[in-house]
From Swiss-Prot:
It comes from Pectobacterium atrosepticum (strain SCRI 1043 / ATCC BAA-672) (Erwinia carotovora subsp. atroseptica). Zn(2+) binds at H170, H172, D183. It comes from the Bacteria. This is UPF0758 protein ECA0145. PROSITE patterns: MPN, UPF0758. Residues 99-221 form the MPN domain. It holds the Pfam family RadC. A motif (JAMM motif) lies at residues 170-183.
Amino acid sequence: MGWEKGLAPREKLVRLGAESLTDAELLAIFLRTGLPGVHVMQLAENLLAQFGSLYQLMTAEQSAFHNARGVGISKYTQIKAIAELSRRLFFSRLAKEDAMLNPEATGQYLQLLLSRREREVFLVLFLDNQHHVIRHQEMFVGTINSVEVHPREIVREALKANAAALILAHNHPSGKAEPSQADRAITEQIVKACLLLEIRVLDHLVIGHGEFVSFAERGWI
């Protein structure tokens, strides 16, 4: 659907607030300019249609933009800067709040990090005794459908970070977040290894495309 001229996105934001803007209008503000014969709003709508959603646009790799008309290096860096600002906003929140009190925010943060990765990545959030995030680390990178995980290395990094608790996470590049039996088995091994040093594993989140599954919510931890 083509763009019809109306209230400009910047003017709409000032008058009605940022929450009143569509995804395309917000994106247009960051893109700033369109192409010869293509208004910036139309460019924003075209990009969202091509990638399928704002989330997929923001998390796409640079190679995915090669066939995106109107997205040179300047606009690509603008888009990735927005995505990185969003990631840092989520992290600043998790660093100040109990990560277990808002599992949805934790899941969204991990989706930003993992959901569009082409290989399985096993990541750990290291938490202090108030469940504030100290840092995160990608511990292991595997293939398109598996990743080899070593519990002792996770324990070693937890001790280095002086972590009192952990949240585990890994992605399924297939897009389906349903945990496998292997996922459950390795989680049990990590929980047992950590308990020996009184480090708690609070959750394990499996990240898909636009969805995630929490072991804690299912009562598996």
